[in-house]
Amino acid sequence: MILNCAIIDEDPEALQLLEQYIEKTPTLHLIGAYKSAIDAVDGIHHNHLDILFLAIHMQQISGLEFAKVVPKNVKIVFTTAFKEYAIEAYKVNAFDYLLKPITYDDFMGSCQKVFERYMQDDNYNPIKRDGFLVVKRDYKCVRIPIDDILFVDCSNSNDEPFIL
């Protein structure tokens, strides 16, 4: 399953760090990285988005205010250096709350929670939505377009799927 993400953060270092974490994670796809909530409006409302990494402190509009206009199906993960906003964040349907500086382990823990929530949804079909099958190959994950698969065979000796 590939989850589409976006980042909104005025801090260039925080933005770059989250971009690197997403690029490092084969099951995440970055739709956009924005320096303000205003810049992100079109990208968020015109793309299928699963996760939004959203800073709280921003100049034009706070992340807490912006969260109120984010589509309800999007999982919002707030990213901030201020733990005192946690209660307010959950009041606007935060899915998770990460304190800066964000480690890769914390980032992955949050993403894992999002994956698990989507997997619990009976109506969620990642192959139908994404159009890709993700398989492990030579110690990394590879995305294979569903339309390119002719058949899958698991009859070899070590029970690894053979995809053609």
Q: Which residue ranges define each predicted feature?
A:
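Non-catalytic signal-transmission and effector/linker regions of two-component phosphorelay proteins
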Residues: 1-4
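Conserved binding/recognition cores within well-folded domains
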Residues: 112-164
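Two-component/phosphorelay signaling modules centered on CheY-like receiver
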Residues: 11-32
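Conserved RecA-like P-loop NTPase ATPase core
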Residues: 18, 86, 149
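Short gly/ser/thr-rich secondary-structure transition/capping motifs
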Residues: 34-36, 57-58, 129-135
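CheY-like receiver
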Residues: 13, 23-24, 37-124
